[in-house]
């Protein structure tokens, strides 16, 4: 799935359903990015962020050839050559890194045969967060952190929101259509929640510093309530209003 990170959320725009186990291959990933470029333009790509499974020689080379900045996490046991030309696990280049310490490696490292900049952040319990990129950027970890928004999206599509997995659909065509409906519903719910938070009732911040309810859940609860009124009470004014706020003429409503 390819998503755009915007205002703390990931907006799903393109996806491929895989009739296989595991992750997408390089051809499938490139097809998604090409589709984005064809519709929105390459200049709209600020950075591509991805997890550890999305690496490879052809993939990295294609991103470089098309001048697409990337910040991609890599596995700590990935084999690389150290300064002496010896093959080691990449974590050995950062063996003395302390928790909370951030280091940008001094030279490019060949990853799958392609030179990349590598940055490392020491985490708790001797873990490492390793990010490969094709440009030097002091904010590489800030960029990579936005990848978490797609995990939030998945949780909204699944247990926290639409229970996508509980449909038990197996036919790819039906799953594809359902995912499209869920993507639209997610955007609608989030937009309604945003609209309410900004114009009607700002969130209360609890003692632990978190909002009392997520923007998505606020919008979803509002949509559910409106649909119940429409179907059970034949009262459609609220759902009609929620449809109207999808337009750009928000100020004229109310």
Short names for language-model regions:
Residues 4-254:
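Single, function-defining residue in the core of a domain
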